[in-house]
């Protein structure tokens, strides 16, 4: 039976969506093609009508998950007043609900350790999406050069994702909730940039001479 291009596109999207959820739940190597196709209501043999390889599916499924996260962030950032935008995204990201439901959450905390061991092609696709996430934040860090905004945004994203990983390791516990709360504060602090450190007082000349003599003695 021949299917229309529209039907094929819908089926393709359904497979990608199923794979996206299962990969985040079980990891890149925890999902078999046969089981995935069965869950999508299709036969194992139909897989290659949609994907050239398992790697192609993995890349597309990762991309789908990350694109959805970025789009949610951009929507939230665009809808709120400037002074509330970053806090709203951080608050919605670092929640017990997100911690406890990796299958429908951000792909980076769920899969980044595995992606680092995948092929260069897979890592490149993942990195491009990760950069888009950083840019989504950088667009809303005002009053600084773009390079500085990206640096702060990268620190924010890294803090948020690292916090979620730690919170999941700690499980549903008081300590895990404490990690989430601390991560929120730290992520928002990243947006403001580092506080200026006090300048170190110059060393007295006598101290420099003593230090030099001590160093010379140690070299003997």
For each feature predicted by the language model, list its residue ranges:
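Polybasic, lysine-enriched low-complexity intrinsically disordered terminal tails
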Residues: 2, 39, 147, 191-220
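Amphipathic alpha-helical segments used for helix-helix packing
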Residues: 85-88, 99-127
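Hydrophobic/aromatic-rich alpha-helical bundle segments in the mid-to-C-terminal region
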Residues: 120-128, 140-203
